[in-house]
């Protein structure tokens, strides 16, 4: 990732640097759910996955987000509270598709997790809210760097964290004037609401699965989808089932599966007003009375190959690579599935082509469309983003920037689904459109709907 960052800096124009520097990023707190392995065969793999997760520098790996960690990144499953059926329904009601999928998996010989995805999400959410995670996130935004968000003794009157991450359009002089004239709350208001309302927590649950479990799941999903398709679409649906069955014959080994659950801070103007009316001058009251909440956004599930066997010579390296690839894929799926979570990234021009430093790691595919934006400064000095066009990823233009791209490791699992069309000669992703007066350096892009 460091080499990519350096390359970006070396090829970025002054105009582009200015655009990127004005972009207010979403904030993410990445966490891991610690659970016991399904069987003893996976015990060592779980240790490798845990070590791999702890070694991730999320500020670099997901550089288009603010790394907004509260410190501890682990949740012990044995400390997670139980939930009622009503609490699960509040997250997501069980559908006929869910029931059919469970039935199809059992028919195919797959051991179904007795804990449903909606139960995982509901229990994690209850854990967060019972342990005041939202309070800690709110506090972290308003405290000096390094202060304890669990025990607030006083707020940072300069609102340094919000100023640094949310007011990128202000000059140093304008920042100084805001502090000197005690006009900080007025200056920071809009930025504060945007930053806090786009503060997310992502919890990753890692499991191991065999090729048979992986392919059976794909077949079952295709079969369930087929049952809900209208007449004209059933031909395509049956083709999807057949494709999954064919892929099953070519998929071998063991895989890392990552289920990612996304939550966000529940924040709006009324929460902003309540914070300053009730707690700004009474930090002790915040410790005893504040009851901010996280809310559930959604989930994703992705897998990546590990070893052909669990005793391969390089099984640790293969498992670590699989964990990183699955983490990236699940994170990218959350972006694709939930528009509010999608980041912007810089658009560049190289050899007369529009390019961006995103690729397979971000699950970019040929034909993907991106909206193009330019920054505009409002009267209040806040930055607004104006859409000026749409561009499309070229047919042979996807860069393979996945973990360990181009590196062959002996003993790797075989994954028939890992057939994304990438151009191994590229060092960036190329768009089919050409630069124009409106679209080029100085623009930002975001995945379109």
Listing of model-derived features with the role each one plays in the protein:
Residues 1-8:
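Bacterial N-terminal signal peptides
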Residues 9-15:
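Sec/Tat signal peptide C-region and signal peptidase I cleavage site
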Residues 16-449:
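Surface-exposed, polar/charged interaction patches used for macromolecular assembly or partner binding
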């Amino acid at each position: 990732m460091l080499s990519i960052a350096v390359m970006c800096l070396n090829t970025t124009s002054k105009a582009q640097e200015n655009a990127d520097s004005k972009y207010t990023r979403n904030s993410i707190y990445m966490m891991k759910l610690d659970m016991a392995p399904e069987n003893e065969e996976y015990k060592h793999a779980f240790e490798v996955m845990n070590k791999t997760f702890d070694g991730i520098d999320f500020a670099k790996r997901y550089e288009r987000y603010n790394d907004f960690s509260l410190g501890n990144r682990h949740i012990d499953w044995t400390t997670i509270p139980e939930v009622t059926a009503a609490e699960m329904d509040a997250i997501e009601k069980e559908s006929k598709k869910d029931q059919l999928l469970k039935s199809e998996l059992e028919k195919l010989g797959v051991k179904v997790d007795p804990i449903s995805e909606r139960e995982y999400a509901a229990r994690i959410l209850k854990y967060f809210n019972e342990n005041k995670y939202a309070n800690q996130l709110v506090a972290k935004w308003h405290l000096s760097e390094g202060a304890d968000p669990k025990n607030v003794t006083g707020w940072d009157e300069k609102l340094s964290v919000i100023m640094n991450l949310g007011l990128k359009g202000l000059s140093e002089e304008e920042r100084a004037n805001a502090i000197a004239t005690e006009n900080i709350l007025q200056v920071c208001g809009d930025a504060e609401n945007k930053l806090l309302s786009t503060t997310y927590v992502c919890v990753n649950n890692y499991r191991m699965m065999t090729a048979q479990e992986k392919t059976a799941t794909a077949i079952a999903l295709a079969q369930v989808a087929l049952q809900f398709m209208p007449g004209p679409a059933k031909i395509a649906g049956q083709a999807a089932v057949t494709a999954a069955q064919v892929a099953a014959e070519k998929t071998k080994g063991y895989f890392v599966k990552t289920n990612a659950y996304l939550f966000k801070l529940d924040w709006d103007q009324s929460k902003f007003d309540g914070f300053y009316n009730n707690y700004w001058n009474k930090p002790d009251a915040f410790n005893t009375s504040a009851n901010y909440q996280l809310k559930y956004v959604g989930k994703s599930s992705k897998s990546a190959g590990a070893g052909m066997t669990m005793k391969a010579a390089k099984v640790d390296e293969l498992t670590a690579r699989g964990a990183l690839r699955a983490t990236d894929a699940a994170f990218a799926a959350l972006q694709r599935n939930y528009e509010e979570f999608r980041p912007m990234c810089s658009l560049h021009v190289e050899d007369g082509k529009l390019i961006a430093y995103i690729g397979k790691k971000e699950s970019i595919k040929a034909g993907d469309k991106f909206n193009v934006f330019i920054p505009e400064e409002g009267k209040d000095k806040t930055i607004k983003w104006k859409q000026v066009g749409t561009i499309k990823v070229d047919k042979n233009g996807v860069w393979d920037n996945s973990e360990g791209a181009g590196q062959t490791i002996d003993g790797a699992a075989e994954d028939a689904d890992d057939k994304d069309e990438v151009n191994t000669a590229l060092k960036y992703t190329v768009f089919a459109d050409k630069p124009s007066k409106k679209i080029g350096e100085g623009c930002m892009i975001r995945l379109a709907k």
